[in-house]
Amino acid sequence: MKKTIALNLIIRNYTDRSIFNIILNGCGAGGAPPYNSGNSVYVDYTFDLGGPQTLTWRDAGTGVTTTAKNPLYIREEDMPKGVRYLCIHIYPDETVELTFTVGRPVPTARGAIILKATGNE
């Protein structure tokens, strides 16, 4: 039997396009406007631990579905004690970063650079 964890999910979209139909391992995770601040929280999503994980999303302008270019893993050893949030950070080059936090997630260092460069900090 696979080991699972229930976490609150936040999505941060650092692209210049709205995206929707975000799906992590077959589980719908909503959408996000361009340069999204991560204000939407999806509560108590259950995720399989391990990997690799599959993440896809659709471009709201073109409808094109994109799959994350890099491998994604949800591992206990990457989580702080008392973890409550998984944040999915989607970047313009179609790579994704997963972060795990006890409190509400903030932009990654890479995300902060993108937001500053685009005037969306």
Where do the language-model regions lie?
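Beta-strand-rich domain onsets/edges
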Residues: 1-7
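Surface-exposed coil/turn segments at beta-strand junctions on protein surfaces, enriched
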Residues: 2, 36, 46-48, 79-81, ...
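Residue-level detector of short, conserved catalytic/binding motifs and their immediate flanks
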Residues: 7-9, 53
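Structural motif
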Residues: 9-17
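Conserved short hydrophobic patches within well-ordered secondary structure
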Residues: 19-22, 88-90
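Tryptophan-paired
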Residues: 20-63
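Beta-strand-rich cores of mature extracytoplasmic or soluble domains
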Residues: 57-121
